[in-house]
Amino acid sequence: MTTANERFIPPDFTNHSPLTWYQAAASRPGFIQDASQRKAIECLDKLWTELMMFKRKRNRFLGRSLRSPQLPKGLYFYGGVGRGKSFLMDVFYGCLPYRRKRRVHFHAFMAEIHRRLRELKSEQDPLKSVDAEIARETRVLCFDEFHVSDIADAMILGRLLENLFNEGVVLVATSNYAPAELYPQGQNRSSFLPTIALLEEKLTILNVDSGEDYRLRTLHSADVFYIPADNLKDRKSGSAGMP
């Protein structure tokens, strides 16, 4: 957030963890802190730290008869429209120096999955093959606007995610809905409940609602305007850095 009289200029993501970036941003004119966002940043910073440690331990593990390091638990944060979820994802994704990372809108990702499945339909288990391909391409997968409303997505999502977890992919997702609220009143929803349980088991679930809607604040105040998250960082996948 910034005021009309004080233009907030975000720090560069380079050489920052999410928390140190947030602290640097908070020291600049025009930045308005939010307790709920700060809590989310701390959770993202914890995951960032675990991913960096995992990378170092995995490098030591390769080629040695050591125990494989434990994969960090991913994160699912949800809240209403205007709570700054895209901003939070911008910070995490921008600060993470992994080469094999990807950020994608969830519905675009599912459309891609269905396309890949059609291309591999002659294989015995096309979904497993698709998941293996994704795991080779991506170690940290970030979803914007995770939501399930289509039965075709709902019926394959559980196995899709389970395969990705088994392949060692770490997921981070934003959503307007808690996992238990996904696929509401959908056809055969009872068969989707194990997918909800899987999300709750494999991901840390965090509610970022704070009662502050920055988009509404924009409409109600001439002195304050919202900085679109896209202005902070280009969302292009696969920036240079660690795999």
Where are these regions (language model features)?
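N-terminal pre-Walker A segment at the start of P-loop NTPase domains
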Residues: F31-G63
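Pre-Walker A (Motif I) flank of P-loop NTPase domains
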Residues: L62-F77, R139
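Conserved nucleotide-sensing/catalytic segment adjacent to the nucleotide-binding pocket
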Residues: R118-F165
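Conserved lysine of the Walker
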Residues: K85
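Conserved small/polar residues in nucleotide/adenosyl-binding loops
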Residues: G238-P243
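AAA+/P-loop NTPase substrate/partner-engagement loops
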Residues: G94-D125, S129-E133
